[in-house]
Amino acid sequence: MDEIVDFSYDAVHDIDPGSNHIAIEPGEQLTMEECLNAILIRSANEVSFAVAEHISGTTWQDFAPIMNERAKELGCVDSNFVNPNGLPNEDHYTSAYDLAMIGRAFFANEALCKMTMTHMLHILPSERQPDDIMEVNKMELIPGGKYAYPYLVGCKTGYTDVARSTLVSCAEKDGMKLICVVMKDENPNYYEDTIALFDYGFSNFQRAVSYTHLRAHETPEHLV
């Protein structure tokens, strides 16, 4: 989390005009933790590009193959990524199932979940960047939000004119954790739809142990 991420000219200026950003300038630096907070709370596109360059070691474009390989490892079957920020491209696509697979890995990380529940992004000025950056988390499912959901573990929104509103979220109640994916929805409907789906799941699903890994002649120990 403390590693330093450099912002190149391309990372700052390759983002689409009018897309979300936090006004970082070329040559400035943030820690990885600051970058992740900016991506999760503000959907900062130049930060996504800088992190992609940092991880790939070259260009943000070279990060896409890494994303695709990791997606396959997580069980994704209907996705192809060509950029690190999810803005529209005919060759960039995913599905609700695949977002749930990615979400399952994401929500297993407590530090990332905590970031999504933070009410305010605050990056203090430093020798690496001069600005006092403050952005309010507009997510309405978190505590204090208009649609605050008491069992929420974490969440991430997305929006483009093409895809409309997307919300991937996780909630836990009575030891059961559910992941909800809502796509091509509208704000604020996607909050209401997410809550309705979680409430349905918690009312109608229950935890069960899968024995599919056992051979035909084997019996679970607790049944012997």
Model-inferred region functions:
Residues 76-80, 88-93, 97-215, 220, ...:
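Domain-terminus/edge residues, biased toward the C-terminal soluble/receptor-binding domains
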Residues 1-97, 106-107:
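Active-site-adjacent loops and short helices of periplasmic peptidoglycan-processing enzymes
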